Amino acid sequence: MTCRIAIRKYSFILCLAVGSVTIYTSEVIGTPLYFVNKELYNKYIAFTKSFAGILFTALVQLFSPTPVTLTYDPELRNLFYLDRNGCLETIAAERNIVIANHQLYSDWMYVWWLSYTAKQHGHVYIMLKNSLKWLPVIGWGMQLFRFIFLSRKWDKDYETMSRHFKFIRNVRDSVSLILFPEGTNLVESTYQRSRVYADKIGVKMPKHLMLPRVRGLFYSISQLRDSMTYLYDYTFYFSDPSPKKYAADAFSLPKLFFEGVPIKRLHIHVRRFPISEIPTEEDQFTDWLYQRWYEKDKLIDTLLETGNFPGPKKLHTTVRLKHRLEILSLFSVLFTCIVAGLFLKLFISH
């Protein structure tokens, strides 16, 4: 390990640790609200959840600067724009479901950044694998955020999802449910496993993607249909200066955040589908979802041929905070508690 990599590595770990401990402590401080007013407690947790969206956006900005080109279907032309500083601004439905193809372990950070551009970063609910819930501090915090941890055992996941969806239906605030239907990131072994399954059920295998898993998304939509407006579909493609066949081989978490391996460009194409128009029968939904994935595959074909996804306009930006001082908001709860404690101490002493 070179000196440069060592400095980057321990700087990243320090920033992540300080930020995570601060956010988790802020969550715990608000616990008494749960026993006083649950709606107020949920709003408080959303407030602390926004800190996490800011933290992870800042970590990408600082340790893995990522140029982004965003395109969208023509009917969405008025929902995306750049502010005077070149930061992306997004107008999203107040209650929505977000799906995306899964290329990297860090994909969820980019989806959270997109939620940040829509001012919904405090209202995301992400589906993650069950093992992550036990990560010290980070996992505990995500449990308080009510993220949905899945074991890939349907009987158990069915109960977990049902419990969380009951909560989400009753939330009076914004909601953005985020999931990756492919279930894992794209590498040679997962692609071949998906190919075997495609051959088994007799469907066409995409060239650049894995087949999406149907059951979880179908159940999510069926349970939330009456409380959600739109489903947003993000197609991600990470340009690799190498290039390697699979982005995950080039851009592992250590390579991105410790070694500083640069992502040449992240291409994102956004589509939107009214929840009310998505099929309600599982067989029809399966066909519908596979068709969306074949369309995503063609979008990537177009990008590889022309250098860009199709769209009426291309927005060029970077993953970053709108204002660097936003990172200080992470400490707002602790600062308030410290100041209040000092005033209380002075009051008692006099």
Curated annotation (Swiss-Prot):
Domain of life where this protein originates: Eukaryota
GO BP terms in the entry: phosphatidylinositol acyl-chain remodeling; phospholipid biosynthetic process
Keyword list, A-Z: Acyltransferase, Endoplasmic reticulum, Membrane, Transferase, Transmembrane, Transmembrane helix
Membrane topology, record value: Multi-pass membrane protein
Protein name as it appears in the record: Uncharacterized acyltransferase C428.14
EC numbers: 2.3.-.-
EC class (word): transferase
Family under the similarity heading: Belongs to the 1-acyl-sn-glycerol-3-phosphate acyltransferase family.
Gene Ontology MF terms in the entry: acylglycerol O-acyltransferase activity; acyltransferase activity
